[in-house]
From Swiss-Prot:
One of its GO terms (biological process) is viral translational frameshifting. It is believed that a second protein is produced by a -1 frameshift during the translation of gene 5.5. This frameshift may occur anywhere within the region corresponding to residues 85-99 of the sequence shown. Thus a portion of these residues may be replaced by a portion of the segment GLFQTISCNSTGGVL in the actual gene 5.5-5.7 protein. This is Fusion protein 5.5/5.7. It comes from Escherichia phage T7. InterPro entries: Phage_T7_5.5.
Amino acid sequence: MAMTKKFKVSFDVTAKMSSDVQAILEKDMLHLCKQVGSGAIVPNGKQKEMIVQFLTHGMEGLMTFVVRTSFREAIKDMHEEYADKDSFKQSPATVREVFLMSDYLKVLQAIKSCPKTFQSNYVRNNASLVAEAASRGHISCLTTSGRNGGAWEITASGTRFLKRMGGCV
């Protein structure tokens, strides 16, 4: 009787980007942001995420996103071309809820201005958006001395993001 063994493969990738490529990519991203801001184009899903990564995490976040999506696309193509598909399977992609930027900014603004006594209900009613903001490092319930008594506060990164995006829309 044959035994079936499953292997899960994971690996790290180090991507190096020359300053010339970085300058070109940064110029292209600024051009894309201006076009989207002026309404000249409506970005597709990939372009939207590139803009978010660029504005939130800078070139490092953008490069991480580009490398990750490139590898995912290459692996999907490899899977389609692979002859023995029964022995090569992919797990489903992690799907996260998509939020409107205005809703996201409202949550950041509310956490920034909401009295600590009202935060519990607000956080409970907007749990998915609060979780998204926390995962991006824009809010935190931790301080340097430990837990903040269960109260959420906007981080310096969250404040910069709010200012960059023009506050609550």
